Amino acid sequence: MPLNLQKNLPAIELLKKEHIFVMDSLRASEQDIRPLRVVVLNLMPLKITTETDLVRLLSNTPLQVELDFMKIKGHTPKNTPIEHMQEFYKDFDEMADDFYDGMIVTGAPVEQMPFEEVSYWEEITQIFDWARTHVTSTLYICWAAQAGLYHFYGVPKYDLPAKMFGVFRHSLREPFVPIFRGFDDEFFVPHSRHTEIRREDIMKVPELTLLSESEESGVYMAMARGGREFFITGHSEYSPYTLNDEYMRDLGKGLPINKPRNYYRNNDPAQGPVVRWRGHANLLFTNWLNYYVYQETPFRREDIKKLGSL
């Protein structure tokens, strides 16, 4: 797809090597069509890695997409050059008057803290509230899914006795919802988290629809407002070696960590991973952009504030 990215974003050259079509803003300006605007609130520590993972998956629509990156004000990442943040990211205050066709809020390494003790909790809840009036459809991923469910619907999270870590089989509860168009009856998703949300809490909230779950890893996806909000507990966006990198990182730190389940060929890290989630990851993001962003967003972006449930 012609994904329109700010010139010099590292993901451009990385994905060109994978034969994925992206264009910088100069070339995109020559195409006379209304692009979709998508904003990513990137809370992950390795921001360039997450950017590349998301761009890879957003690259499968025939529509032009303008991608912006948002950051938490006053928060200085430890693993990303400050020059990169200054060039490609904006604070929420700078974007609060804008409207977006789609938004993605990533996970964050704060899941074992109570929500209210997260240093940027007040700001992120302001962003969540803003998204309801300024964004057509939002994907909340991993910790962001837990945070959004808690903020909007009072759904709690629970500590797990051991990290949910690996690639797990999932089933569809609502197979005819467009977000699952083209999905198989069962599909695989990576998970990497120390906490969970529980189906009984989702089922208590009439505004929420439980879409998919796993016998091993529990709730995977819930939907609200007819698809204006999706809460996704797994990491479909992960590249093949992300779980391996997390495993080796924790081993190197001497942390208690088991091998990611259902991941390595013959359960042997030396043999590398078996990738079983790539196809459904691409379908997930393509379907979201098509059915919940492109087909539902008004031509005049400022009319997003008039939208109800889809």
Curated annotation (Swiss-Prot):
BP GO annotations: L-methionine biosynthetic process from homoserine via O-succinyl-L-homoserine and cystathionine
UniProt: substrate binding residues: K163, S192, R249
Entry GO CC: cytoplasm
Catalytic activity: L-homoserine + acetyl-CoA = O-acetyl-L-homoserine + CoA
The keyword Cytoplasm belongs to this UniProt entry's keyword annotation: yes
Subcellular location: Cytoplasm
Site (Important for substrate specificity): S192
GO molecular function: homoserine O-acetyltransferase activity; homoserine O-succinyltransferase activity
SUPFAM superfamilies: Class I glutamine amidotransferase-like (SSF52317)
Transmembrane segments: none
InterPro entries for the chain: Class_I_gatase-like (IPR029062), HST_MetA (IPR005697), MetA_family (IPR033752)
Gene3D superfamilies reported in the protein's UniProt record: 3.40.50.880
CDD domains found in the cross-reference section: GATase1_HTS
EC category name: transferase
Active site residues of this protein: C142, H235, E237
EC number: 2.3.1.31
The entry's keywords: Acyltransferase, Amino-acid biosynthesis, Cytoplasm, Methionine biosynthesis, Transferase
Pathway linked to the protein: Amino-acid biosynthesis; L-methionine biosynthesis via de novo pathway; O-acetyl-L-homoserine from L-homoserine: step 1/1
Site (Important for acyl-CoA specificity): E111
Entry keyword annotation includes Coiled coil: no
Pfam families: HTS (PF04204)
Coiled-coil ranges per UniProt: none
Role played: Transfers an acetyl group from acetyl-CoA to L-homoserine, forming acetyl-L-homoserine.
Family that this chain belongs to: Belongs to the MetA family.
UniProt name for this protein: Homoserine O-acetyltransferase
Organism lineage string: Bacteria, Pseudomonadati, Bacteroidota, Bacteroidia, Bacteroidales
The gene coding this protein: metAA
